[in-house]
Amino acid sequence: MYILVWKKGQQIKTFHTLDEAAQFKAASNFDEAPMFSVTVAPAISASGGSNEATNLRRLMYLSKGTNPEECNPQFVAELARVATIRNREIGLSGFLMSSSPFLFQAIEGTDQDLDFLFAKISADPRHERCIVLANRPCTGRMSGVWHMKDSHMDSITTHDAMMTILYQIARSFSSMLTYLPKRAGNMLLSGLDPAAQPPEPKSVVVTFIYLVAYGSLLSNPYSTEQPAEVLSTFVDVCVKNLEGSGGIITKFITGICMASWPFNRTEEALTAIQQISEDLAQLPSQQAPGSSPSLMYSQAGVHYGRAMLCNAGSGKSDFTLLGDWINTTSRIATLAKKLTSPVLFSFQVRCLLGDEMREEIEGAVMDQVKGRDKPVVEYQFPGPERDVEVVGQKIEQFTPGRFRCQMRVGQYEALPISQRPPIFDDTPKCNPRPRTPGCEGRQRSHTLVDPHIMMAKLPGPSVSATGDTTVPTLTYISHATRPMSRLDLSAIMGTATRINALQRITGTLLHGNGLFVQTQEGPKEAEINLLLRIRQDTRRSDVATDHMPQPQERVYPSEWTLTSGKEEILAIFPPLQDVLSRLAKSFTAQETYVPSRVVSYLTAGNNPRELMPVSCGVVMTDICSLTSLTENSCLSEVWMICNTFIDACPSAICQEGAEVIKLIGNCVTAYFPGNNADSAVASAQELFTFCREHRQAIVDVLDVRGCVSYGVALDNGQVVMAQCGSEGLTEYVVAGAVSARVMEVEAITRGTCPRWATPLWSADRLSPQLRDHGIVPTPQAIEGLPCYGIAGEEFELDVDSIKLGIKALHAARSGEKPLTEPEEAKLDFSPGRVRHGDSGRRSNSAQGKLSIQVR
């Protein structure tokens, strides 16, 4: 029986044959209507009735065996024997499929029975990383009894395409899932696309946890090789305590952690934050002399309010919480420095506490929060003070002695080309733009094609004359955009056979029930060109690709083959298509949230830990005066502002060959190749020009985006790129002294007139023409060295006019009379945004070193 589903599951129709379903779908012009092959058989439920007499649910999960050597057909056969006996007694049915070391399992039964069995599976020491791929109601059983016979992939099929794609996508899928925020990961696993979900207002308790004086720790010349160790410790401590208390970690921002809880877990949140402070304070007694983690201390701010849970951006996305309350939380965290308190929380948080915890609170303190006209009431618990100046003095006096970190920092340009890691996308761009402000060029989408082009540049032996000993295997899975008839498949087969024979590509294309699975072998360049053609094929969608290390010899014969999976595989295991479909969609969606360098390295069969530390330039962008703009804006307007901003930034950045490091609401950080500073300047020019033209396009409309202005800062220096975390959540960090310094350079965009929209700290890496004619020095200096701005009146930023325009917008929308300019000058007493600790992105340690003026 075949089932056709459309209108997001609201309409369902069954057919006896696949041709009937395909004809009905084509005649009805349904573009998004998946078809499922289902075998329904009677079975006895745990309550003794038929499967129609009880509510059935189908649970599908992926796990990894803790001992891959034992995950062989004999091991799976023993699992089948035991599971058949036990699960038949309670009325469970399903199948188990193995592709060592991964296990795919679908279970059907009642809610109570499934919950009980999955709890046992999760606690089974033979499994780890149990990931739920699907958990939804079903109308009938695919298997009348517990079916595990011939469940090993080697037994059910001889097609290497199926074994390859399941193993490779499962490996990359489970690895990349650790980089995703839990909310986005849960949506992907439930079959939802986070980008398609509408923004959801939520009442949450939010915290920002800072590593005290982390910028100074990065700037210390004796600790530049230890940031990875410091951050890995910080990530592990936060994950253990925050997630253990029911919190959800939204993101890590170098030395900062952002997390949230539901309002009924406020006491658990404060307890977890206090425990983090205590755990870090105990590190000095547990570390070897000269180790940087002995200098780790934390300070946190906690606040409660309404925020918008939403997806911002398209090409590169950030699934996060947005809202004015989020900015206020980060400002409360910066006040902890002034009050020397490890944990500081607002009056709204205090109202959510029970009587017992309220009795422990010290007296209230009223203080001015940056960006707010009205003071904020804060509270703290009694305990030892956390003096930032004392911590800074310890860092200045720090010497590692004989202690040496295992991670060595090297110069990217000094490495031989064959040994350089593929952390930069230097693929040819479509229609390169001239280096002139405001020049429009066709945007190049950043997709999974780019990492696979980068994969072709990985170091490796050259292709031999025959191409048979060094050919890599590339696999992909995709969905047909329309029903494929035998004539369509014959046309695909004829074209593929002719073209691939000329390119010396061999492999297998498997088709069944609207699903394409393909593995191919051949020269790298030919495979990449073929992949590009596949992605441009309008007959396919949701193309998810993966890559295997190079085999010693070809697996496939010289002839290209096409196999119909309907008769040989999918008819035997109907859920197999569902497994592949869900893995493909989730794997494709992950790329927008996971750093591209991680995707490219994982899909090339490498470990991200092996990425060598390099020296590179850093660019940082920021929406100026966002706090005063969002203070009187609704949550949907905040989301609209950040969504527009995040869409514009990665487009301009990736177009110039850079990589996005982090999307942080109204801030985007990225890195450029150290030898291509001119591209960083061109990207900054495009961003500022886009913002100006966007404001001009809606100048006659009362739209909050009409007051948005960008400030862009450029700096270069040495950073460490490393994978941090071992407690289930992984963060790929890019950290160095330049990470903190570029934030201070960005503060020049709000300095005294003229305000430079694109300041840069060093001009050493610019081309002679741009250095001599394209930049001018600024009055401000950082660390005794001059800063520069891009020449031209169009690149000056008038913050006073921006703030005046914001207040005029709010006054016009509320029906009030706008203030005149003299009155505005008298009343404009808001301290605005000081970049030391701004929005959860500022390191506390860099304060007091600069001579720049901030508002």
Swiss-Prot record:
Residues 842-855 have a biased composition (Polar residues). Residues 813-827 have a biased composition (Basic and acidic residues). Residues 56-149, 471-563 form the BLUF domain. Heterotetramer of two alpha and two beta subunits. InterPro entries: A/G_cyclase, Acylphosphatase-like_dom_sf, BLUF_domain, Nucleotide_cyclase. SMART domains: BLUF. It is found in: Cell projection, Cilium, Flagellum. It comes from Euglena gracilis. Disulfide bonds: none annotated. PROSITE patterns: BLUF (PS50925). Keywords: Cell projection, Cilium, Flagellum, Repeat. One of its GO terms (molecular function) is blue light photoreceptor activity. GO terms for biological process: cyclic nucleotide biosynthetic process. One of its GO terms (cellular component) is motile cilium. The lineage of its organism: Eukaryota, Discoba, Euglenozoa, Euglenida, Spirocuta. Residues 420-444, 813-855 are annotated as: Disordered. Transmembrane segments: none annotated. The 1224-5/9F strain is deficient in phototaxis. It is not known if this is due to defective adenylate cyclase activity or defective BLUF domains in this protein. This is Photoactivated adenylate cyclase subunit beta-like protein 1224-5/9F.
